[in-house]
Regions:
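Short, hydrophobic-biased segments on the C-terminal half of alpha helices
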Residues: 62-63
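N-terminal helix-turn-helix DNA-binding core of bacterial DNA-binding proteins
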Residues: 18-54, 76, 80-88
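Alpha-helical residues within the helix-turn-helix
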Residues: 49, 66-67
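An amphipathic, aromatic/His-enriched active-site/gating alpha helix that lines ligand/cofactor pockets
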Residues: 99
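N-terminal leader segment of winged-helix/HTH proteins
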Residues: 1-23, 68-70, 76, 90-91, ...
């Protein structure tokens, strides 16, 4: 019997570096934990109320997490919601385990 084909996320070196950089910041790590603790997409307003930073600072951190591929952003008009991309996080930890 043939081996099952593995379906997953392939990370290139650039994305691995972006993820490492994103997770190195304690605020972004906490934001990722906060988003990951929800089973449904988390609204920006809900994230904002729990973070003692300005809207601009929060926006910067969320953009870094998005650029790293760690979160999926869904925009509806001027509102945004965020979801943890568990597949990307899993692929990253698997890459680290190979070191």
């Amino acid at each position: 019997m043939a081996a099952a084909k593995r379906v997953g996320v392939e990370l290139d070196e650039e994305q691995i570096h972006l993820i490492a950089k994103a997770l190195a910041d304690p605020r972004r790590y906490e934001l990722l934990r906060q988003i990951g603790s929800c089973t449904a997409p988390m609204e920006c307003a809900d994230i904002r109320c729990c973070q003692p930073v300005s809207a601009a600072t929060l926006s910067h951190h969320m953009r870094e997490l998005e650029m790293a591929g760690l979160i999926r952003v869904t925009r509806e008009g001027k509102f945004a919601s965020y979801t943890l991309r568990r597949d990307v996080l899993k692929a990253y930890t698997e890459q680290l385990a190979k070191i």
